[in-house]
């Protein structure tokens, strides 16, 4: 009896456990290849790009087409030789959504699994901290109804919130002067989506991921994203060797709580920043206020450099990108950092948290799509 068939019922074929893994690996490679392209591909093109044998690619494409994951969209035109069929992601695979929640705004975005943003919408902000869940459900209900009516179900959701999120519990953490109360939202509170397909994280973390993937930090394995947001809230997203650092309780990067001064003059860094009047809705500060704020941000950045040695510093957020602030931050870093560290402006502006969240929802959807076929 062949090895592996011992104990099998007569007449029943035993499949190697490695076969399913090979199939899943091939399908993942094909789907990742489709995701990386702006247009559909033929089986031959998929085989060349993935370096997988044409027969294995053809078999995988047949499985994906039968499972309504890929769809034939027509022949390849304008090339010599036999007519080849193009394949693209099937619309029925669905869409992903991201929702960004702040005290003053709720924004939603919908994208497909190929990385294209399909729409953005604005929604009523929460009346208070306990209204967050209701606003989230309203935004997602609108998104779900609109896209399911088009035959495109909601596959994954990412929620960006202006609070830390405990990675162990998946729930919002409350700190002094943070936007929302503790536990106001958790990943398991999102309705109508498999909990495994829900991501909840801090807005600065999502912004850092967006700058890593599509912004100023593209290609940088280690960097620090320094974010100055609404009401002069200050946070840091830290990426080391390509991985976002969250900390044991999701508090990594909460530099607004750095203590400054001494004795009776002791105060928090975030409070000192707020005193400079740099708010996004305020008039432009005078040069002295800008220089003071830039100096404080630069000193905080130098402390980060001394501990984690990032390859670059990215300054972002609606307040962090105010004209003139960057040069003061950079000058302080040049003066005080142990080694030279480039300081650059974020490339994505105020869209960074929402774009980062949408990309994370898409990543989760891809994982679910492939694992469901493994």
Regions found by a protein language model. Give the residues of each.
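Short glycine-aspartate micro-motif
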Residues: 96-100, 154-158, 223-227, 235
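ATP-binding/phosphotransfer module of carbohydrate and carboxylate kinases, centering on a glycine-rich
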Residues: 1-75, 79-122, 131-142, 260-374
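Conserved phosphate-binding catalytic cores of ATP/NTP-utilizing and phosphoryl-transfer enzymes
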Residues: 75, 79-96, 198-226
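Short beta-strand scaffold segments in enzyme catalytic cores
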Residues: 106-110, 209, 234-238
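Short secondary-structure boundary segments
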Residues: 161, 228-230, 312, 317-318
């Amino acid at each position: 009896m062949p090895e592996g068939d011992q104990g099998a019922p007569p007449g029943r074929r035993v499949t190697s456990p490695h076969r399913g893994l090979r199939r899943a690996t091939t399908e993942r490679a094909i789907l990742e290849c489709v995701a990386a392209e702006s247009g559909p591909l033929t089986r031959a093109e998929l085989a060349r790009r993935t370096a997988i044998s044409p027969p294995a690619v053809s078999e995988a494409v047949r499985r994906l087409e039968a499972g309504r994951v890929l769809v034939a969209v027509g022949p390849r035109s304008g090339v010599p030789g036999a007519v080849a069929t193009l394949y693209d992601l099937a619309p029925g695979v669905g869409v992903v959504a991201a929702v960004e929640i702040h005290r003053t705004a709720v924004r939603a975005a919908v994208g497909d699994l190929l990385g294209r943003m399909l729409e953005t919408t604005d929604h009523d902000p929460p009346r208070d901290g306990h209204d967050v869940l209701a606003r989230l459900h309203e935004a997602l209900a609108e998104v779900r109804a609109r896209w399911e009516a088009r035959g495109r179900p909601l596959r994954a959701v990412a929620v960006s919130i202006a609070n830390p999120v405990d990675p162990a519990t998946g729930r919002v953490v409350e700190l002094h002067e943070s936007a929302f109360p503790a536990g106001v939202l958790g990943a398991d509170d999102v309705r109508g989506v498999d909990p495994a397909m829900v991501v909840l994280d801090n807005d600065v973390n999502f912004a850092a991921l967006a700058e890593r993937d599509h912004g100023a930090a593209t290609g940088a394995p280690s960097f620090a994203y320094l974010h100055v947001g609404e009401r002069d809230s200050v946070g840091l997203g830290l990426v080391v060797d390509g991985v976002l650092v969250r900390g044991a309780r999701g508090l990594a990067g909460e530099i607004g709580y750095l203590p400054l001064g001494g004795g009776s003059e002791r105060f928090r860094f975030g409070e000192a920043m707020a005193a400079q009047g740099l708010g996004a809705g305020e008039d432009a500060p005078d040069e002295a206020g800008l220089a003071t704020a830039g100096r404080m941000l630069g000193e905080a950045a130098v402390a980060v450099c001394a501990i984690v040695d990032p390859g670059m510093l990215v300054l972002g957020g609606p307040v962090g990108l105010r004209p003139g602030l960057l040069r003061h931050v950079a000058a302080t870093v040049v003066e005080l950092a142990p080694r030279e560290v480039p300081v650059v402006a974020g490339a994505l502006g105020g869209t960074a948290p929402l774009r980062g969240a949408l990309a994370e929802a898409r990543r989760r959807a891809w994982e679910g799509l492939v694992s469901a076929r493994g």
